[in-house]
Amino acid sequence: KQDVYLPDDYYKHPSEDDNYLEYNLRTPWRARVSMGSTVDRYFAWGVEYEYANYGKNHMSYSDYEYDSWGGGYHRRTSDKAMNDLNKNTLRGQHTVKMGFEFNATDNLALRLGYNYVSSMFKNDARLTQHIDSYAMDYVSGTGYMNLSDVNLITCGLGYRFKKVYFDLAYRFRQQSGKYYAFDDSFTGEGQFVLDNPNLAYATINPVDVNLNRHTITCTLGVKF
């Protein structure tokens, strides 16, 4: 048996400050245009279009270095690795919304709506497990899923009494995804090819995932 003595400062328990990263996330601008109208008291319609480029997400962090302009030790530095990842995997998203309502009678209204949302992921988007970023260094999980566009269709009716109203709606949300168990891009890298010649340039086929959803909602209300 041999006793080993370590200096008091050999191991330091991490404090809150050691595990805390203050960061700033700037989301992209959104451009939106819409129009709508009514025809007498019987028909109303509306259309809206929106665009947002998620590849322009920008992350920065506080490096606490001396800022000669501000005269202090607190400033924000752009997280280049994370911003490059956003640029390489995300893209502009288009959203279209349309809605129509027809008053069949003074009490009965019929409704129809449609939404389209394009996928924010690029077709060749991949999970990067190692990112030289202050916000995130390693990703322990290997699986990831790229989502497709969304199509949303709704229809319904509403009936109004003097103090009671009733609404019934059906909603269908259509979307799919491609699930990858791991990123196979590294199988073509030089060192991997040399170390694993039998697995060189191996690829994995994604699993198609059905994310369709059907929803029926019913509302009964009373006005006082």
Q: Which residues make up each language-model segment?
A:
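Outer-membrane beta-barrel porins/channels
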Residues: 1-224
